[in-house]
Amino acid sequence: MDIFNYSRRETSEVNIGATPMGGSNPIRIQSMTNTSTQDTDACVAQAKRIVDAGGEYVRLTTQGVKEAENLMSINAALRQDGYMVPLVADVHFNPKVADVAAQYAEKVRINPGNYVDAARTFKHLEYTDEEYAQEVRKIRDRFIPFLNICKANHTAIRIGVNHGSLSDRIMSRYGDTPEGMVESCMEFLRICVAEKFMDVVISIKASNTVIMVKTVRLLAHIMEKEGMHFPLHLGVTEAGDGEDGRIKSALGIGALLADGLGDTVRVSLSEAPEAEIPVARKLVDYMTQRRNHPYIPGAVAPEFHYLSPERRTTTAVHNIGGENLPVVIAVRLDGNMDFNPQFTPDYVYAGRQLPEHPIKGMQYIIDADLWNGQPDTWPAFKSEQLPFVSGFNASLKFLFISYMGLDDEAIACLKYHPEIVLVAQSIHPNRLGEYRALAHQLMNEGLKNPLVFFQHYAEDEVENLQIKSAADMGALIIDGFCDGILLFNQSKQKGGKKISDKVTDATAFGILQAGRVRTSKTEYISCPGCGRTLYDLESTIARIKQATSHLKGLKIGIMGCIVNGPGEMADADYGYVGAGRGKISLYKKKECIEKNIPEEEAVEKLIELIKKNGDYTER
């Protein structure tokens, strides 16, 4: 794999109805219904909305035999109206349901964590090697008949591993690790290969973007070693809604698409299913438009480990680099110093002039030729100003530099001036590739100057800014290169809708939180809902956010059902999980505190629980 130059991973083609995936096919877009699969009319109507929005596959929850059998009616109704979209049955806990669904759906998703193994209980189990091998043989004995049904019906399958539903068996041997998630998948893949069943798609998902990216990278590596080329389905589970859902999804999925991984994408938003499609389409189009870009001659640093990257070692300069959290640098070239108190930047790049009334305590960056040592101001240099750096008596200096600008003169200057913080800039079609090449060259030269990434856009829609900036930063954060972000946006044309500076600042902070390197607000782990969700998910999320959005650093899980609920919420402080029609269970960490609370009382009960444990503060 060339991490500097974009190209898609070569995969085998999988036939899914009339819409094949992998091989030379484009990256496919999909979503999932949240209606009851026994309600034919509701499912058909929602599937049509997904297709009309651009969706190429529609997945439906299939929790029982009745739901599996009704896929035939849903399929027939769609085709009668000219909708030839392949249907995907989503099966958990019951392999018999998968057997039935394979007769009516174009693809069946099974979850290795609960296909044969018992549902996760978080208990540690002890196995001898022989006992463990026997458990794997049980999978083979049950899985092969299912594969035979799929062969007979020309049905594809997805082996869909979720971080939140790994079995106790896998957890006990491998722990809560990427290695465990990958092995959970490989157990099934090896059976498929042995049985010569190749219409297989794979997914490994998590709500934690770092775990999700590292695990998919590892899976692709292991498959390559074993000669497997199955296509990959990408997604961040429980990404949430609104800006959080878009930023988290774009960061995680974008980091993988940037490396050519991924043959189909689902952006899991806690919104109407059809709302996911435009977001996924924008993300895929943005990442794939860099194909055939000019070559980037990067050299991977020997100490860099792609499968398990660690933060690049840097020297702290004031509060940048070293062990410090990544900083946010805002741009205020027009003198506007209006900030959101929750998302106040660490530094402000003011360009050619300081504001008339600087904010006390705010740190300003101004162009070096205008800097005269004012308090709380720091000079910024361009590459052509390197000869003058030594003449400035400042303990913190910024240097705007491109990858090609990192020449012998710049390297010599940086070795002599550890107080310089680099601000990477690029106009290359594959900006991420150049930024990676710059970071690796710094390591190759033994330079420890902190590195901030200048991400600039010309967007009139907030969603576009969120998707593109998060996708561009994902791999840089996960690879350990990010000591800060400078996010700047200009509208495309005069008179266009201007995205406010405060929204741009909030986006920068949101990216760092989605990458799990800096927390600035409450974090919500909320699923998109499906046919198993028996309460009003969207309105519930809105009510919980309204009551808790000021609780910085608190993690709250809001889950439709127990399939991934307790598992994906494992690192959440509190959890709100559907327990039946109109019933909710509340969790503190992994412990269920109260069960079967009426839906209309549950949000208030959640707030009471947070207050009882001393984690609630008034606004």
Please give the residue ranges for each predicted region.
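Glycine-rich phosphate-binding active-site loops on the catalytic face of alpha/beta enzymes
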Residues: 56-59, 105-121, 258-274, 480-494, ...
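Catalytic alpha/beta core domains of metabolic enzymes, predominantly
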Residues: 126-143, 148, 170-320, 393-398, ...
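Active-site beta->alpha loop and helix N-cap motifs at the rims of alpha/beta catalytic domains
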Residues: 2, 55-187, 318, 327-433
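N-terminal amphipathic alpha-helix/helix-capping segment at the start of soluble metabolic enzymes
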Residues: 1-31, 147-153, 289-336, 546
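Beta-strand/loop-dominated core regions that host nucleotide or nucleotide-derived cofactor-binding catalytic loops
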Residues: 581-584, 592-615
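Short, acidic/polar
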Residues: 38-49, 93-98, 249-253, 335-341, ...
